[in-house]
Amino acid sequence: MEIPTVFACSSAQNFAGAGVEILENLGADYISFGSESGNIEELAEISRVMEQNPREIDEFIRLKIKEGLSYPRARIQAIEMITGEEQAGILDSPNNILAVEYMRKIKRAVPITVKRTGPGYNDVTAEGELASASAIRYLLNENRDISPLLPGESKKILMKAAPVSEEKYFNMLCYRALSADIAQMDKAPAGGEGLSNKLKNSVRLCRSLDDLADTLKSKRYTRTRIDRFLAQVLLAIDRDVHTENYIRILALSKKGGAYLKDLKKSGACELTIITNMSKENLPEEIRYGVSRDILASDIYNLLCERDMYRFSEYVRKPFIAGE
């Protein structure tokens, strides 16, 4: 399965919520995720604090953001106010943040966390056979050997595809920023006061993605939020257009296919299950989300210099193992 693009390009809270909703609707009994903490009780405690004190935390965060603090830093201070500095420090690490959001959203399944070891989330170095996704992308773009870091089949797939370089992505972003009007870009969910205008004024002056992101970044807007904002601008994701979550099947076994068929018949799954993106009778409540998936795929194919028809979401069907 995949998380729909609208949620994949969203905040940790929305990303986690969409993922958990998909898994629980599919009947998952356990949900496993990585964290720097590796301590499920520790993560559960922070989750409980956030669930039990939403009004107090939200008011504190709003106040601190008005003072110029970023959302992540304001949230840490809000938790510190309730639990003390030691516990709140958990939210300084990116995978702990996501883990806490998973814990907040899980209703039925049993959560399990695996302690992350080796390089950090955004580290572009590798240690032995351990590397972050950022490091693998960096090494691939540098034409370095990634064999020890990936399963053999994954390496074959990556080596066949032209990597999406930051330069290509940056050029596409610049075109979008120059051609879109500020009112359109203001609708990006991760946007903020003056950010769209600053983007439009900066693209002619910046020479790389890092240069652009650093120009837009501020005490209030973190690099992570800027990266989300830029992706949302490129994909014209509109905060005012609602889409429901749905389950997009990418691959399955024959046994999995039979399970999905029984799940649909039972009515236990409340989300739409999609195996064919070209169907014209998709429910109205998910059409916008699907349209962003298709656009994201088309842009990716352009950036990878792949055949636009052959690799189109309209043409590709789920991979069935064993066939």
Language-model region placement:
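Active-site rim/loop-helix segments in enzyme catalytic domains that contact anionic ligands
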Residues: M1
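Active-site cores that bind ATP or allylic diphosphates and position pyrophosphate for catalysis
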Residues: P4-E323
